[in-house]
């Protein structure tokens, strides 16, 4: 019994690193480091135990060819071929990843070899793969494997032999005009193949294909350049807004734009569209959580469909039109199930195709998701219903929206304005606003929308009554009424007399007595301001303690760095305006605290060490390790001082004079020595250096039997 308990404990044992990884995934399901830990652990376990981890992995990253391949290889290793085929059915058509497709072909080749129909199945698999992934820049090996497979097929009789030659030639000719790496080698192999069949016919066959091959080879070089730097194995994660991600997005878009520019210079619109869509498919494997990529792909298909329809190719036009709808469907069914932008774009696309029932199903599908705010969905749904089916249909959607407890006040504003603008019925709009006021009377934004509507109608009495109702009913908390009071004052300033203005100001001061105690003049600013014009300078407004309620509200709604500066004028005088300069992020700075007596090789300031450049890393690997050098160590300061004191000569003659201590005596004619012994033996005296006593007494005389000098003199003679 104790042995069985130990076995169960061993089976249930979970390593600490796995527990930490699981905890990280609870906080962030897209933590790639945590997933790497789980993958390594799964690879060391039996497939029956690891399958759950793999299923979680491909569910979290359904577009990652690398992760699907890991899962499939684990099943192949366990010889679970029925499960392998089901996995291929789940991922192969959706994930156009070159390594995954190579794995598929390898699986068919290894497992179907003993079947009677192996040759047909293998040929179908290769044709299927080339049709889907043949435009991949790294697809050379698939083309070559297919050709070698066809060459190895046994052919009995001349008819079968001709069939095989035709099949091989067809694949060669398709491959030689397809831009990819190693296209030159494929072309050379094709030349040899044709020459091996019929050398006389080969010349014409090669000449016919040569121009297309040269074009494909040119494009292949551009293709390789534009794909350089793309991280094509990165799993698709939600936007992180990092510089590295922005760089990858930019590179992917450049690749797609390059394909759109028609580098092959072909007139076949179908081929252009297929190549562009292949680029989009490759991009979506990595950037599947970016809605703009999905939308642009669908838009491109829609444009191509219209272009083909204009040319009369109705079959391909319909094919691309349906494929555009399929792009939207894939997006909202997989990675972007809650992305309203794509739902709305999908609905508009189907509306343009007059498929209204489909549009209703799209909106209802989004509304069925429980953990979303459906307010904007109902608003767009109402607008569609009014456009496509009339005002009555829009009213039905509004009724449905009122019954949904998740909706907010915006649907009432939309419905009221829709009635006013479309049915021209002010009374219906007025009733909707009144109905909403009972439910949302404590929300300033709704009250302001109602006020704007009445102001637009120029109904002064009704507007004034609404102000009084809202401000005296007690439904609106005092802390939320600031903007209503500001709007009331602006209203009276525009249409009322001075007495009514002063009355509103007094009531407003009473409502905010604690906040504006001693700052009565600040309230005066609102009486005289207009839009972004103020009766005081910015510094004076600060001194008054003035606070613009409407501006503060707008700043809270609009993201400051992107939109606010262009919409909200800055309260600055011309004198106060100073040029904006780029400033460092001081929060990231490290205090300057140099180490005292820092050891050699260590940066004196903490945090000052930086990564070595790649070229320097290579050099450092070639050099011996530091422990091999025991000295002597150069005194850098003294060495630099010597360099500083050195006088660099401007001419060769001056350099010779400094080195030798005097001008050289050159022999003009005869066999005499070039230099005198006095010059050669004169000691070199450095500037700014004390002379030794021995040097002052005289020059050092060279040895009598100086063999080196004797040989030099013989050469000169």
Swiss-Prot record:
GO biological-process terms attached to the record: mRNA 3'-end processing
Cystine residue pairs: none
Repeat region (HAT), residues: 45-77, 79-110, 117-152, 163-196, 221-261, 271-303, 319-352, 354-387, 458-494
Residue numbers of Phosphoserine PTMs: 691
GO MF: mRNA binding
Stretch list, region Disordered: 684-705
Main function: One of the multiple factors required for polyadenylation and 3'-end cleavage of mammalian pre-mRNAs.
The protein's name: Cleavage stimulation factor subunit 3
Organism encoding this protein: Pongo abelii
